[in-house]
Amino acid sequence: MGQACGHSILCRSQQYPAARPAEPRGQQVFLKPDEPPPPPQPCADSLQDALLSLGSVIDISGLQRAVKEALSAVLPRVETVYTYLLDGESQLVCEDPPHELPQEGKVREAIISQKRLGCNGLGFSDLPGKPLARLVAPLAPDTQVLVMPLADKEAGAVAAVILVHCGQLSDNEEWSLQAVEKHTLVALRRVQVLQQRGPREAPRAVQNPPEGTAEDQKGGAAYTDRDRKILQLCGELYDLDASSLQLKVLQYLQQETRASRCCLLLVSEDNLQLSCKVIGDKVLGEEVSFPLTGCLGQVVEDKKSIQLKDLTSEDVQQLQSMLGCELQAMLCVPVISRATDQVVALACAFNKLEGDLFTDEDEHVIQHCFHYTSTVLTSTLAFQKEQKLKCECQALLQVAKNLFTHLDDVSVLLQEIITEARNLSNAEICSVFLLDQNELVAKVFDGGVVDDESYEIRIPADQGIAGHVATTGQILNIPDAYAHPLFYRGVDDSTGFRTRNILCFPIKNENQEVIGVAELVNKINGPWFSKFDEDLATAFSIYCGISIAHSLLYKKVNEAQYRSHLANEMMMYHMKVSDDEYTKLLHDGIQPVAAIDSNFASFTYTPRSLPEDDTSMAILSMLQDMNFINNYKIDCPTLARFCLMVKKGYRDPPYHNWMHAFSVSHFCYLLYKNLELTNYLEDIEIFALFISCMCHDLDHRGTNNSFQVASKSVLAALYSSEGSVMERHHFAQAIAILNTHGCNIFDHFSRKDYQRMLDLMRDIILATDLAHHLRIFKDLQKMAEVGYDRNNKQHHRLLLCLLMTSCDLSDQTKGWKTTRKIAELIYKEFFSQGDLEKAMGNRPMEMMDREKAYIPELQISFMEHIAMPIYKLLQDLFPKAAELYERVASNREHWTKVSHKFTIRGLPSNNSLDFLDEEYEVPDLDGTRAPINGCCSLDAE
């Protein structure tokens, strides 16, 4: 058999012998019949035993046995019983043999009406076949099939169906069956609740009924009458609400003991306090709690009843205050849990109506009552406690939601924490202190936020109750504040406020470090804060800690953003282009390219020969010559501001400065003019390539990506996770300039073109990272082998990357003097970085160590492995680019000759740059000898 999962009842059908009385089993829970019980009948004992058996059910298998025994005991000639339980939302399932009850015909009629239905058998179409063959109509004239739907009125649905093949019923048997039906439904509810809670200790089985008085033992009438009354009471105890259940029990006790009122004082789990929610026939609006001390505490300890004469004056005063009347008589009886053998409540009866004292018989009545009702009472209380916990969990989730919506302002968040903590714990006052170095600071109170720092409260982090909690990290529950050595009552004396009790708990962050303390003062509906309040505070503090930590972090991030924004504003202010500058630039209009130099569009032209002051106009001239200004309707003043802003955006390291950016942009112009790029790329792609060349090294610091990561710079923190640290920074600076007022040259673009332009710029600028070039080199070779396909988008992306890299290294395509001068500038930068790395305690690469680097060999290696393969690919794709490859190869030969000369002669000193400043000659390619001086004018080329 075993226990079914979820709501599925597994049942067995069986042929039964003649009905036999059932053994009394376990503890019972009864439902009140709809009609008054008839006079005692000979079968009353059998019915009572059957209902007691149902009352002891705690699992599925026990429920099945109890249902069979109960129906066999109260119904005539029971032949077959099938029990079905709702499985899921609609299926009614039986196990033995496994089958589902079809909800058709008579069964469907009974389920819809939710009323028992008797018939001379079920239709063949209503049955699943063989399992229910015995129930097919017609049956014998003196037998019938009962279809009994058990409807859960709270859920508004049928929870189970019982099919019984039995004889015709008499009136007494009809009444007994009603009782069995209701008790079966209650037993089913209890089993389902126990299943949801998980495994618990099973209640002990009831041994024998309590011994009656001497009068009871003289005859069975008194015992039967009392048992009938308790049976009727148990039939009413189907409530899941503890207050409603207490009302019924207390009314029964008042009637049986002739007391003016009764109450149940529930004992807390920690045995420290009593609570009362129901007095007589009245449910209190607020639960009353008071300490479990004095004589009442002795009752819990000794498990013995007491009367009024045994109470102290303090106990009497406490009870009279709760009841609102004077006590003339009282009987207090401990209610003991069968599961734990501990006192769970005190049943109290007050002021006998006849003015007499309570007797031993009254005590026996109370004990007899709770002998049968204590289990259902404790189960209901436990269920209600779990419901309360569920509500508290839901409240905590709502609290968490409220807290996490106020992360943008710490003060507002703390005010929300105070409000929620006070509401959850029913405290009069709440204060929150944040730990600031060695002090606890409070500037948010119940009354609001203190803006003036002179009014905020600061206390040492190791003093007082809050300081103790902050130091130890442990919660502190103080029932009597004035009796605690850490409490300072001077504030109470000066304000007139009385602090009765305190619950102080730490607030910790994710690392379990104390970041604050919350202090709750004066429990409103209890003598002090309970263990439940401690658990609630502990759970609440987790949400507080996370929200406060994130709010403080959010504040720091905001402050950092404000500082960054301010720094950007300052940078943009100093980079700001005055009206005079761009007006002067455009005063005579845009100069034609031919006016700059007759060879300006030739690969042999050296852009570094142009004075820096003339470079901005040269940029405008190139853009106009490529017809981008007209095609994209670019506003000339905006373009002028943009060019001047980009120029100012470059720092002044030896190599990566504005003149490098201008040289790279000029080479892009040369590619456009000499290689007919319009046959390979779209206009917007060429435009993006040119603008990217201008911006590709914005704000370069003269150090590479590896240095940024090793030095843990701000740039590395921003971009290291994505790679290409400096390149991403260059792109970000370009976007910052475009976002500067009056500098957005793409302002007239459509949304689609604007987004595409920015995407192209990002990809092209990131392609200047040589690590990126090496990753795509095989793809570039493959594209060169198969030929460029203008319709292939991947070829467009690869070609743009190749063109950008060739522009970036274009100094290597110029004459020897330019190449040698550029090498000097580059290695000055490298050696400066190497010096910084040495100062940091790191070992620089050989090429950046001025004491180890041999520039000719380094340049030869660079030419052979990086520059020459790039321009070889360019030559394969564009035959007109052959002269570029040849010039790079020529420069490589020059470096070989220089290396050979100094291998024989030796370097002038241990400083690797010295030889570049020395006058020497090497044979030129045409056999002549030309002077080489790093400081000579580049115009000589």
Swiss-Prot record:
Tissue: Widely expressed. Expressed in brain, with high expression observed in the corpus striatum. Also expressed in heart, placenta, lung, skeletal muscle, kidney and pancreas.
Reaction(s) this enzyme catalyzes, per UniProt: a nucleoside 3',5'-cyclic phosphate + H2O = a nucleoside 5'-phosphate + H(+); 3',5'-cyclic GMP + H2O = GMP + H(+); 3',5'-cyclic AMP + H2O = AMP + H(+)
Active site location: 656
Residues carrying lipid (N-myristoyl glycine): 2
Pfam families hit by this protein: GAF (PF01590), PDEase_I (PF00233)
Covalently attached lipid (S-palmitoyl cysteine), positions: 5, 11
Stated consequence of mutating residue 149 to L: In IDDPADS; uncertain significance
Residues bound to Zn(2+): 660, 696-697, 808
SUPFAM superfamilies in alphabetical order: GAF domain-like, HD-domain/PDEase-like
Free-text activity regulation comment from the record: The 3',5'-cyclic-AMP phosphodiesterase activity is stimulated by 3',5'-cyclic GMP.
Function: cGMP-activated cyclic nucleotide phosphodiesterase with a dual-specificity for the second messengers cAMP and cGMP, which are key regulators of many important physiological processes. Has a higher efficiency with cGMP compared to cAMP. Plays a role in cell growth and migration.
UniProt comment concerning the protein's domains: The GAF 1 domain functions as a dimerization domain. The GAF 2 domains binds cGMP, which acts as an allosteric activator.
Membership in a protein family: Belongs to the cyclic nucleotide phosphodiesterase family. PDE2 subfamily.
Disease: Intellectual developmental disorder with paroxysmal dyskinesia or seizures: An autosomal recessive disorder characterized by global developmental delay, impaired intellectual development, language delay, and early-onset paroxysmal hyperkinetic movement disorder that manifests as sudden falls or backward propulsion, eye or head deviation, and dystonic limb posturing followed by chorea and dyskinetic movements. Some patients may also develop epileptic seizures or only have seizures without a movement disorder.
Annotated protein name in UniProt: cGMP-dependent 3',5'-cyclic phosphodiesterase
Species whose genome carries this gene: Homo sapiens (Human)
Taxonomic path: Eukaryota, Metazoa, Chordata, Craniata, Vertebrata
Gene it is expressed from: PDE2A
